Amino acid sequence: MKQYLDLEKYVLENGTQKGDRTGTGTISTFGYQMRFDLQEGFPIMTTKRVPFKLVVSELLWFLHGDTNIRYLLQHNNNIWNEWAFERFVKSDDYKGEDMTDFGLRAERDSAFKEVYQAEMEKFKARILEDEAFANKYGELGNIYGKQWREWKTSQGETIDQLADLIEMIKTNPNSRRLIVSAWNPKDIPNMALPPCHSLFQFYVADGKLSCQLYQRSADIFLGVPFNIASYALLTHLIAREVGLEVGEFIHTMGDAHLYNNHIEQVKEQLSRTPHKLPKLVLSDKPATIFDFDVADISLDGYNPDPAIKAPISV
C-alpha cells in the first residue's frame, strides 16, 4: 500500500533519532495520518506477508474481553508472548537462567538466544498445559479487551463500551460520541503494556461506516501493519452488524517510529512494488460480532511478497 510505504519513507527522511523505553533507539516523528478507502480492497501489506490469521485471532481475543495469552497460544498466535514472559521471569517463581533484557541480549548473543528460546518454549507449554499457571502468568492486566468490554467505574459498575457503541450506531448514527477508549489511567500501572492504539471513533455518512484510530505509539515496521488490518477488519465486522457499507479507515499516529534495528528491513520493503489488495470474506453464519471464530474470516486474492523478519523490542 502506497500510504504505508510513504510513511516509512517520510520517517526515514524526516524523523529524529530518539532513545526509548526498550533501549533499542528509534527514528521518530510526531503526528502522521493515513487514509484507506475500504471499498478499494482490504488494506493489508502486499510488499511483505502479514499473517492475517494472527490479526484475526488477536482481534477476536479483544472482542471476547480476554487478556490472557492462553487463547492466543491455542490459536498458534505468539505476538503477546514476550510481555507475559517478562512478567514471569521477574517473579520469584522463575528459577531458570537470568533473562534480564532478554530481547536485546537474544539479538546480540547467539548463545543466549538459544537459552532464551528454550525458556520461552517451556513457558508457552506450561501456559497451555497448566490452567493455574496460565491464570497467574498468562495474564497481561486490564489491557484492550478488558477496557473495551468491562471498563470499571468508580462506583464498581462495568461499561461494555463496544456493545454500547454498536447499539448507538444502530439507534443514533449521527452521534459524535461513537468512541471506544482503551486508555484508562487508573489501570495503566498494572498493564503489561499500556495501550498503543488507545482510542477509536466511528462516523456514519451516506450509508457508510468509517473508523478513525488514534495510536499514541506506532511501531511502524512490526506493529502498524497489524493495526491497519485489525481496525479495517473491526470496521467491516461492525458495518455488517449494523447494516452499513464500509467507508474509510483513518489511522492517526502520535509517536510514529522506526526502531534502529528495523532500518535495513524497511529499505528492503521500500524496494518492492505493491500488488492488488485482497478482498475480505466473512461467513454468513455468526449472528453478531461476538460470535465470530477464526475460521469465519478469510482473505481472497492475497498474494504478497515474502515476509521480512525483524526483532521485537519489549
Curated annotation (Swiss-Prot):
Originating gene: thyA
Organism ancestry: Bacteria, Bacillati, Bacillota, Bacilli, Bacillales
Keyword terms, alphabetized: Cytoplasm, Methyltransferase, Nucleotide biosynthesis, Transferase
Binding site for (6R)-5,10-methylene-5,6,7,8-tetrahydrofolate: D219, S313
Protein residues bound to dUMP: R21, R176, R177, R216, S217, A218, D219, N227, H257, L258, Y259
Associated pathway: Pyrimidine metabolism; dTTP biosynthesis
Active-site annotation: C196
CDD domains registered for this protein in UniProt: TS_Pyrimidine_HMase (cd00351)
Location(s) in or outside the cell: Cytoplasm
Name of this chain's protein: Thymidylate synthase
Assembly: Homodimer.
Catalytic activity: dUMP + (6R)-5,10-methylene-5,6,7,8-tetrahydrofolate = 7,8-dihydrofolate + dTMP
Family under the similarity heading: Belongs to the thymidylate synthase family. Bacterial-type ThyA subfamily.
